[in-house]
Amino acid sequence: MNDVLNSGAFSLASLIVSMVVLVVGLALWFFVNRASSRANEQIELLEALLDQQKRQNALLRRLCEANEPEKEAEPATAASEPKEDEDIIRLVAER
């Protein structure tokens, strides 16, 4: 047993194990770093998309406000509709 330790086989095995651990560690670091950079790119794209959607919503609000009909015409039509709604409610039996 003492001959195996002194012959250098043990140091060679130790060197091989440390090299394997180093290669596995570098591979893990590569994939974690790659995933992190892709996640950062996706976050940047999502933030840009959010900014564009906010601008589109603001533009849509302005367009809707510009195309909105005058409010004086609405109360006249709204006053006649509740009578029809009341007739329908009277026909439906309560449970």
UniProtKB/Swiss-Prot annotation:
Query: Where are the disulfide bridges?
Result: none
Where does this chain mainly localize? membrane
Segments traversing the membrane: 12-32
- Give membrane topology per the record: Single-pass membrane protein
The record's region (Disordered) falls at 66-87
Location comes to: Cell membrane
Keyword Isomerase recorded: no
Kindly give the InterPro entries that the UniProt entry links to this protein: YebO
Q: One Gene Ontology cellular component annotation?
A: plasma membrane
**What keywords would UniProt list here?**
Cell membrane, Membrane, Transmembrane, Transmembrane helix
Q: Tell me what this protein is called.
A: Uncharacterized protein YebO
Q: To which species is this protein native?
A: Salmonella typhimurium (strain LT2 / SGSC1412 / ATCC 700720)
Q: Which gene encodes it?
A: yebO
